[in-house]
């Protein structure tokens, strides 16, 4: 750890404390994540080390680069490129952002580029939210943070500071207890983030797992075997769930153009097998006026 000098604590993420730090060798500013392990006395699980090592291979302009992994005295430090702005802070400080449909489209496109890259390497995020979409102020590039960490460390119910980990972006198959979910969970999260950029408020702001599910079902309609084959077999599905009819998504996101609404509805399909893929979303007509392909 001698190589890195902590400058200041900048936040407390899902997995531990995040510091702004300096690489003594290059003088570069970096972000240092100290991973808090549940079984501290047992040291770092080898599975976590393996997973994290794979993430060093992931290099893409829309992913926050993992530069180094430092494993010392039962502690694990992850060294990332330093970015001090995230999408949540950006939205909170820019009330005009919702009116800039072009900017929203560019952000969404970049988020999907990063996700498509990760999915092509069989890496899931599982906990996408505006707080872990970082923005490079100099280029307006959006970069995804914390990709792959859920598989290495699991997603705790609470952060180590006892904040509840948000459920607002969590896919219905996870909320219903599915153990066999895959890449569509990230696409669901992106749909929620897309709607939030347009509306300037979260689409499904549930305060518990059941409240989250019901907020979703009130808009999408309560699923059944016809609309989502296999749903009644999921561990946490209850036949006593209220049976809400589906609403037109246009009533929930009134300021979105028709092509955007079509894309949004294809990310927010309850049945994960019918949800659009990240790669498919990039080819959607909503993006037809975007010239560059990162």
From Swiss-Prot:
CDD domains: STKc_CDK1_CdkB_like (cd07835). Phosphorylation at Thr-14 or Tyr-15 inactivates the enzyme, while phosphorylation at Thr-161 activates it. It holds the Pfam family Pkinase. InterPro entries: CDK, Kinase-like_dom_sf, Prot_kinase_dom, Protein_kinase_ATP_BS, Ser/Thr_kinase_AS. ATP binds at residues 10-18, 33. One of its GO terms (molecular function) is cyclin-dependent protein serine/threonine kinase activity. Its EC number is 2.7.11.22. This is Cell division control protein 2 homolog 2. Belongs to the protein kinase superfamily. CMGC Ser/Thr protein kinase family. CDC2/CDKX subfamily. The modification Phosphothreonine is found at residues 14, 161. The active site is at residue 127.
């Amino acid at each position: 750890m001698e190589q890195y000098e902590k400058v200041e604590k900048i936040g407390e993420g899902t997995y531990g404390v995040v510091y702004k730090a300096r690489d003594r060798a290059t003088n570069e500013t970096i972000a240092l994540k100290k991973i808090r392990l549940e079984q501290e006395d047992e040291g770092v699980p080898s599975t976590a080390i393996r997973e994290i090592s794979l993430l060093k291979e992931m290099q893409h302009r829309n992913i926050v680069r993992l530069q180094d992994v430092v494993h010392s005295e039962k502690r694990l430090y992850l060294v990332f490129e330093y970015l001090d702005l995230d999408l949540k802070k950006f939205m909170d400080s820019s009330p005009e952002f919702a009116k800039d449909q072009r900017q929203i489209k560019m952000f969404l496109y970049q988020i999907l580029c990063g996700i498509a890259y990760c999915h092509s390497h069989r890496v899931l995020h599982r906990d996408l939210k505006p707080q872990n979409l970082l923005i490079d102020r100099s280029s307006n590039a959006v970069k995804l943070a914390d990709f792959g960490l859920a598989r290495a460390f699991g997603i705790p119910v609470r952060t180590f500071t006892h904040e509840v980990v948000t459920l607002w972006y969590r896919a219905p198959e996870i909320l219903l207890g599915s153990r066999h979910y895959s890449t569509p969970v990230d696409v669901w999260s992106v749909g929620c983030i897309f709607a939030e950029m347009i509306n300037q408020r979260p689409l499904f702001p549930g305060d518990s797992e059941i409240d989250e599910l019901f907020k979703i079902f009130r808009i999408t309609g309560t699923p059944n075997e016809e609309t989502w084959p296999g749903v009644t077999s999921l561990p946490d599905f209850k036949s006593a769930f209220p049976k809400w009819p589906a609403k037109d998504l246009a009533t929930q996101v009134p300021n979105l153009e028709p092509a955007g609404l079509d894309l949004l509805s294809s990310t927010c399909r309850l049945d994960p097998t019918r949800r659009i893929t990240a790669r498919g979303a990039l080819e959607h007509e909503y993006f037809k006026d975007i010239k560059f392909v990162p």
